[in-house]
Amino acid sequence: MKTSLCNYSEFKIYPARGMKFVRGDSKVFHFINTKVESLFFRKINPRDIRWSMVYRRIYKNTTTDVSAKKKARKTKKVERNIVGASLEVIQQKRAQKPEVKQAAAEQAKREIKEKKKAAAKKAAPKK
């Protein structure tokens, strides 16, 4: 069952109840009864009417639904092991100084070049 809210008092309006008023600028207002409609046309602010939901909300006379706030999901950085290297080894490499890292990288490059040369010699045809 679809219900709407009264534009003035904010009470629920059930189907086949209430009335609609269409203003000149095509804005549609839903009212629950003629009492509310007359207050609206007299431009009486609903904050001043003690039984309206606006008044009750301002002065905390109504029990509001206490809904738990949804916690925003925060991304967490998780350290995971890489196949062939444990977490301790990775952390040790991160803690190394840049000079040590550079030297290790150059050493690895030299080893790769030597392996390529050795493979090229084996693959080279004999004369």
Swiss-Prot record:
GO biological process: cytoplasmic translation
Gene3D superfamilies assigned to the protein according to its UniProt record, in alphabetical order: 6.10.250.1270, Ribosomal protein L24e (2.30.170.20)
UniProt keyword annotations, A-Z: Ribonucleoprotein, Ribosomal protein
Region (Disordered): 93-127
One cellular component (GO) term of this entry: cytosolic large ribosomal subunit
InterPro entries (alphabetical): L24e/L24_sf (IPR038630), Ribosomal_eL24 (IPR056366), Ribosomal_eL24-rel_N (IPR000988), Ribosomal_eL24_CS (IPR023442)
Short name of any one Pfam family annotated for the protein: Ribosomal_L24e
GO molecular function (one): mRNA binding
Superkingdom assignment: Eukaryota
Composition-biased stretches (Basic residues): 115-127
The keyword Ribonucleoprotein belongs to this UniProt entry's keyword annotation: yes
Record's keyword annotation contains Ubl conjugation: no
Family listed: Belongs to the eukaryotic ribosomal protein eL24 family.
PANTHER family: 60S RIBOSOMAL PROTEIN L24, RIBOSOMAL PROTEIN L24
Descriptive protein name: Large ribosomal subunit protein eL24
Lineage summary: Eukaryota, Amoebozoa, Evosea, Eumycetozoa, Dictyostelia
Gene that encodes it: rpl24
